[in-house]
């Protein structure tokens, strides 16, 4: 995890956060989740009869991990909106889907659902560690 985009950066991270937890809240995980949500949205809309081409869906799936955060920052300076910056960036990476990315969605759909997914992943990580801790304490208690 040497790529700075693969870890959440905060002054207290090095002191208190594990690498796994930093990864959960990293920019690449957050913005990759945005793209996966847009893909799920487009797939659902296509199933409901909205004209979304297979080519558009294929391009979106192929570009899900193609994150150029420098270019996203340029778009964000231009639009002054983080979600719209990434809509345009994803459209650059999946040109056939440019007109349908984020179709019918709000920024809250993307941001709120991403937060829920990342917090769920973080809680699963915590749960795993708590279970290990309880098992170790139980073994220690039985031994002593």
Locate the predicted segments by residue.
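A helix-coil-helix interface module used to build multimeric assemblies
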Residues: 1-144
